[in-house]
Amino acid sequence: MAGNRSNDIKVHCSFCGKSQDEVKKIIAGNNVFICNECVALSQEIIKEELAEEVLADLTEVPKPKELLEILNQYVIGQERAKRALSVAVYNHYKRISFTESRDDDDVDLQKSNILMIGPTGSGKTFLAQTLAKSLNVPFAIADATSLTEAGYVGEDVENILLKLIQAADYNVERAERGIIYVDEIDKIAKKGENVSITRDVSGEGVQQALLKIIEGTVASVPPQGGRKHPNQEMIQIDTKNILFIVGGAFDGIEEIVKQRLGEKIIGFGQNSRKIDDNASYMQEIIAEDIQKFGLIPEFIGRLPVVAALEQLNTEDLIRILTEPRNALVKQYQALLSYDGVELEFEKGALEAIAGRAIERKTGARGLRSIIEETMLDIMFEVPSQEEVIKVRITKEAVEGQSKPILEIA
């Protein structure tokens, strides 16, 4: 309620002491008054304190070995990729802390965004999520295939930033130190090395648009998403300290690597090194191969850290099912334990689940759906069968040849 200037008694701000005649407005509370100037000042103080809290958090970033230990609790395999990510993430946040306190003549540390290359279900998204969670920073996921360059029907790249701002509860200072994971980046590769003379709505044009926010810019983001409109209020966000991790399967890139290494299959009758079809060339990938695949040189240059993930084998998938803190087997065992029922997966069952995931080429992300198929009837029936004390999942149950074995009290 504003003070009434027609009254003889003047109202004064309880904080700065200014009268109602010296300020634009005074708000009355329970025996307390505050002027518009003190409201604005308090908002500025809160904003600065929030920013200081964000910076304070960054001074306690785990060391690379500590980050690796955290990743090992949740992510099986991919040792080289986990090491590369741990070092890159640590250096990124160390750079932010250094930049905030450096002198003008100090070394200017460049941002090291990350490119993850690996088959579907190898753990790219999960690695990025786990890192963000362990650092307690805002995290957003975007799909590159939904993006188009400005002026075309589709999603503007700025909407990626809106997702991060929303993940930070609209605290822009926190969002400016968050992590964004852009998936399916290989799907916006050019169709060839030569620049096309036609418009490339979802390829090179999107790479150019992403390039601007990845390398660092002050972007204007519509608060409600969608396209920008004249006279629309915008959120300003500086992307120079946002860590961008982009990932994709890059199907066929190993053939490009083989060609570069001189191991391309040569016609009949000619001498050539024999190719080991079971060998992986993922760790041999260099920038030249990625450019040949279809990413533009400027875009590759902003992704100096390349983490290659291998195809997960049967042993890896079994470990994923059983070892991590949030392993699927542990989750289902916990669910049935709430009904007083013990759940056991035989070794053959685990091998069958892993084998199905490999057959379907879904990797780790396909494990849950396979277990759901196997467990559906059990999860439906057992809670009503009080006499059941244990459920045993066999290989035959996974393959649909028989039902799981129930043990009765």
Swiss-Prot record:
Zn(2+) binds at C13, C16, C35, C38. Residues 1-54 form the ClpX-type ZB domain. Keywords: ATP-binding, Chaperone, Metal-binding, Nucleotide-binding, Zinc. GO terms for cellular component: HslUV protease complex. GO terms for biological process: cell division; proteolysis involved in protein catabolic process. ATP binds at P119, T120, G121, S122, G123, K124, T125, F126. SUPFAM superfamilies: Glucocorticoid receptor-like (DNA-binding domain), P-loop containing nucleoside triphosphate hydrolases. GO terms for molecular function: ATP binding; ATP hydrolysis activity; ATP-dependent protein folding chaperone; protein dimerization activity; unfolded protein binding; zinc ion binding. InterPro entries: AAA+_ATPase, ATP-dep_Clp_protease_ClpX, ATPase_AAA_core, Clp_ATPase_C, Clp_protease_ATP-bd_su_ClpX, ClpX_bact, P-loop_NTPase, Znf_CppX_C4. NCBIfam families: clpX, PRK05342.1. Component of the ClpX-ClpP complex. Forms a hexameric ring that, in the presence of ATP, binds to fourteen ClpP subunits assembled into a disk-like structure with a central cavity, resembling the structure of eukaryotic proteasomes. HAMAP family: ClpX (MF_00175). Belongs to the ClpX chaperone family. ATP-dependent specificity component of the Clp protease. It directs the protease to specific substrates. Can perform chaperone functions in the absence of ClpP. This is ATP-dependent Clp protease ATP-binding subunit ClpX. It comes from Streptococcus equi subsp. zooepidemicus (strain H70).
